[in-house]
Curated annotation (Swiss-Prot):
One MF term in the entry's GO annotations: ATP binding
PANTHER family: GLUTAMYL-TRNA(GLN) AMIDOTRANSFERASE SUBUNIT A (PTHR11895:SF151), TRANSAMIDASE (PTHR11895)
Record protein name field: Glutamyl-tRNA(Gln) amidotransferase subunit A
Active site location: K77, S152, S176
GO biological process, one term: translation
Lineage: Bacteria, Bacillati, Bacillota, Bacilli, Lactobacillales
InterPro entries: Amidase, Amidase_CS, Amidase_dom, AS_sf, GatA
Family from the record: Belongs to the amidase family. GatA subfamily.
SUPFAM superfamilies linked: Amidase signature (AS) enzymes
Purpose of the protein: Allows the formation of correctly charged Gln-tRNA(Gln) through the transamidation of misacylated Glu-tRNA(Gln) in organisms which lack glutaminyl-tRNA synthetase. The reaction takes place in the presence of glutamine and ATP through an activated gamma-phospho-Glu-tRNA(Gln).
Keyword field: ATP-binding, Ligase, Nucleotide-binding, Protein biosynthesis
Record note on quaternary structure: Heterotrimer of A, B and C subunits.
Cellular component, GO annotation: glutamyl-tRNA(Gln) amidotransferase complex
Broad class of enzyme this protein falls into: ligase
Species assigned in the record: Streptococcus pneumoniae (strain 70585)
């Protein structure tokens, strides 16, 4: 059997009853990955040997009947460290990097009995919004292989949407979980900054990065967040987990919940069919008893400019460590130390990564720091204050995840600004450190449309409550791409 139509709870029951073993489930998952991989290119590394060793150990120890994730396979984005499994960040620079430790999020998942089956493809060093900047080639959209899957967590989203795996981990710096979740018609959550440890995540923008879960349904997404969230002494920005169970409000009604709909999120640049889908979703929330009202987030229009200054500046600093000396790619044509640095970085980094390093270095340089980086920080504060004003009166914010559905592969590669604008609606959430989720809300041109719900810090359980209420009364999450197939 392929098991790709079974929910996590259904798989758990099969494992506990010993109708299947963790090894059999892992083998079936590996076959699902391999059978779809040529079409999607969603994995950089398939960790077959390591996964089967893990599965055997779990079978020998016995499935934990009280832990729904015991024996469940997990795919991990390739910028999240995995002990003994290549972690390349989809870059030539780290083509041979094999960590000797697990990221805290991965270690937490393994503690729950999850089995790492592979590392998913991504935009190089998480810099990109289409899944096309990977050194290992572009990932394809699960619904239409001529379209982008979104990025940067392209492989993690496509793998879940296509039925290669049920659950995966991604990272979100400016929308890198939510946008590919929207483009592939699945559920992706960016947690409150600090909820999931960044230890072991290859750093891009340290004040923005956050690891989060992908799943086909809201509850399964929350179950994975339960597994990975933790305070961590190895990450000074991690926070105590304030919610014992992220599924605790799932199933509760949302009567009286106040939801804000920012007028800026449905303005210029939003595809008309996407706008219509979101307005219909707002009406659906009203039918469920929520109060939906229009609000304004006046500084959100500056989000993209602020983000690309701050994120690029942080990337410029973080990526200085990759110099061809200690590990990673080293240029063979270098004859002295300066040439090792210059040639290794020039040859090891892709074009988008180099573009952002240069932008960040410029923003931090003497004479420009005040005009760019300092000013961006000041406007970031205004964006945060806009959210705080809205959340003084509302429980959640509703809007589209992306301005459009998935676009054609190679259609925006020569227009980086246009590609950057595709993150217009997700970036402000990262700048403010807030939680945000993307859930399926409809279709346009045969492609999924994502609905984004944003909450104040540490409101994940309320976000899941509203998302689950919408999911329970619609069937968008049940519709699957052709490549998904079914149980056999």
């Amino acid at each position: 059997m392929t098991f790709n139509n079974k929910t996590i709870e259904e798989l758990h029951n099969l494992l506990v009853s010993k109708e299947i073993s963790a090894t059999e489930l892992t083998q079936a998952t590996l076959e699902n990955i391999k059978s779809r991989e040529e079409a999607l290119n969603s994995f950089v590394t398939i960790a077959e040997e390591q996964a089967l060793v893990q599965a055997k150990a779990i079978d020998e120890a016995g499935i934990d009947a009280n832990n729904v994730l015991s024996g469940i396979p997990l795919a991990v984005k390739d910028n999240i460290s995995t002990d003994g499994i290549l972690t390349t960040a989809a870059s030539k620079m780290l083509y041979n990097y094999e960590p000797i430790f697990d990221a805290t999020a991965v270690a937490n998942a393994k503690t729950k009995g999850m089995i790492v089956v592979g590392k998913t493809n991504m935009d190089e060093f998480a810099m990109g919004g289409s899944g096309e900047t990977s050194h290992y080639g572009a990932t394809k959209n699960a619904w239409d292989h001529s379209k982008v899957p979104g990025g940067s967590s392209s492989g993690s989203a496509a793998a879940v949407a296509s039925g290669q795996v049920r659950l995966s981990l991604g990272s979100d710096t400016g929308g890198s979980i939510r946008q590919p979740a929207a483009f592939n018609g699945i559920v992706g959550l960016k947690p409150t900054y600090g909820t999931v440890s960044r230890f072991g995540l290859i750093a891009f923008g340290s004040s923005l990065d956050q690891i989060g879960p992908f799943a086909p349904t809201v509850k399964e997404n929350a179950l994975l967040l339960n597994a990975i969230a933790s305070e961590d002494t190895k990450d000074s920005t991690s926070a105590p987990v304030r919610i014992a169970d992220f599924t605790s409000k799932i199933g509760q009604d949302i009567k009286g919940m106040k939801i804000a709909l920012p007028k800026e999120y449905l303005g210029e640049g939003i595809d008309p069919e996407v706008k219509e889908t979101i307005l219909n979703a707002a009406k659906h929330f009203e039918k469920l008893g929520a109060i939906v009202e229009e609000v304004s987030l006046p500084h959100s229009k500056y989000g993209v400019a602020v983000y690309y200054i701050i994120a690029s500046s942080e990337a410029s600093s973080n990526l200085q460590r990759f110099d061809g000396i200690r590990y990673g790619y080293r240029a063979e044509d270098a004859t002295n130390l300066d040439e090792i640095y210059v040639n290794s970085r020039s040859q090891g980094f892709g074009e988008e990564v180099k573009r952002r390093i240069m932008l960040g270095t410029f923003s931090l340089s003497s004479g420009y720091y005040d005009a760019y980086y300092k000013k961006a920080g000041q406007v970031r504060t205004l964006i945060i204050q806009d959210f705080e004003k809205v959340f003084a009166d509302y429980d959640l914010i509703l809007g589209p995840t992306a301005p459009s559905v998935a676009y054609d592969l190679d259609s925006l590669n020569h227009d980086p600004v246009a590609m950057y604008l595709a993150d217009l609606l997700t970036i402000p959430v990262n700048l403010a450190g807030l939680p945000g989720i993307s859930i399926p809300a409809g279709f346009s041109q045969g492609l999924p449309v994502g609905l984004q719900l944003i909450g104040p810090k540490y409101s994940e359980e309320t976000i899941y409550q509203a998302a689950a209420a919408f999911e329970a009364t619609t069937d968008y999450h049940k519709q699957q791409p052709v490549i998904f197939g079914g149980d056999n």
